[in-house]
């Protein structure tokens, strides 16, 4: 009997021991804990969240977490109502009526009204830098109000009704709603106080899914706005990490749940562990080949572009998470147009003679993306051609017109926003030929195909890569999305 009892005790002990391992294993699996806390690092805790001029994309994320706009942009670039429940546009495309939802509240429990939004737009027009509020400056009377020439209430076509905000533009603007989705247009009360968020965060009320609960030198905490209509995670802890390597080290010991753009050396491992989310972003890089008194003929520019594309493809084959090669498309979405791509491929393969130089010089802004591209191009040319690439990485010097003229090529970063081609091509204005500038400066232009073909035929401005946003996630997270502007959509975190 004693022997049987002994064996029973041994068996129970073994079972309990194994159950302990099972429980331990289950704790390593994803758990959707809405009452928990998510932590991630950024390179600096912001002291202000007023003007967006000097805010990084990660600082903009905070504005998006604690405030909402009339509309937002989904990850697939669709305009969706946010504070608005419905958007009515008149037949001329000039007047917009935003009907507000019934269930929108400030974090103190008071209802968000049309007057709140009108008052915010009034303050935003006064306080924000002009380049950041182009959508509102296209509204009737706003430029005169900003210049102090008229009163807002009587001269600006932004009006509130009982449950709507009505805005009338000077002229049709197909990008108006898209612009309104940007962080600067998100509803913030007492905007001037946001200029010193460290001091004033506790005195503010918030329109978003979160409110700022604490701001210090080393971290900021966001707490769920109990008045929000979205079911979101309870707390977000944003910590000051001097580098992404520091964030990654903390992630490895489970002190960070999110690492945005982790070191490229970690990407393959994270992907294998199914802890990496890769999403397309608008950031892209383009090659400008200077036409210094026709020093490089068309055939030369064609071959240089082809070789640089080969260099980048060689790097991308080993690092396929960082970016997508452009393959002759100025916008990522255009890569679906196989007819256009095939025509450009045929054009780029034309053969001819030209006097190849021993050295080609390359200038670009000093950032991580350009360092990788420049080094890859240099190494590939060294191994595969008789041309030496000498590149320079600069900061403020990139504004020096004379300096840029002394280089054969430039790498330029731009936002490849297919819905705002006017702004996209305007950023290349100084590098366009006279004929190309005439195409760009037409009073009304919706079809940019002639300009694009001219750029490609002349080989003066050419697409290279479209970047991806890579995010490492912990076991706490099963879903993570960026909105159409590249900001974290905290409402989708699960």
Can you name each region flagged by the protein language model?
Residues 300, 306, 319-356, 368-371:
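Structural transition elements
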Residues 42-63, 83, 110, 176-186, ...:
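A structural "hinge/loop" feature
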Residues 41-91, 122, 205:
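N-terminal lobe/hinge region of extracytoplasmic solute-binding protein
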Residues 224-269:
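Ligand-site clamp/hinge motif
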Residues 169-235:
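Gly/Pro-rich hinge or "lid" segments in bacterial periplasmic/extracellular proteins
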Residues 315, 387-398, 412, 421-478, ...:
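Extracytoplasmic/peripheral linker and loop segments enriched in polar/acidic and small residues
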